[in-house]
Amino acid sequence: MKLVFATGNKGKLREAREILADLAEVVAPSELGIFDDVAETGSTLKENSILKARGYRELCGMDCFADDTGLEVDALGGAPGVHAARYAQDIARRDGLPLPPDHDFSANIDTLLSELSKCPGAPRTARFRSVVALLLDGEEHFFEGTLEGRIAQARSGSGGFGYDPVFIADEYPDRSVAELPEEVKNAISHRGKALRAMAQWIKENICVNQ
């Protein structure tokens, strides 16, 4: 079975290939000569993930899966949530400031730490949440994973991506996710949990019928 993973992120692609190695050949759209983007216009992780899966299914003509991830910070009422990748832009727009580039995670982290500084004494508990949408044989299936933790006071570590330098997972309370080896991070990651749930579903519902 061959599945398109709707991502251009090499780290995500490597993680998915490791988890699905015995079940499916995972290819990226770029490996099929597809470089178009699909707009993430949904208001929830589930909506965005299925929008991407549908879009790339149409572009590639193959069964497809896609993910969307958000960061939920309790002291900020669940923000940035589904808007994690453009949080700095959202806050700059709110405050009438110049807009930083899209997907600028250095600016996003600065904005997150700044917003939390306005909540002294509030718990810094947070979670990453990933939803994976699988479009297979015309049917849509969804899988979810979370990683619980807290937001650090400052950046540490150079690994990972996104908010990893300021996210401390409950499983490793003495370091940021950006300081964890890749294999350790993948073992506990929100996306990894969602992908493993998808792999288990494929094993139980597809492979047994082949």
Regions found by a protein language model. Name each.
Residues K2-V4, G11-Q210:
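Anionic-ligand binding patches
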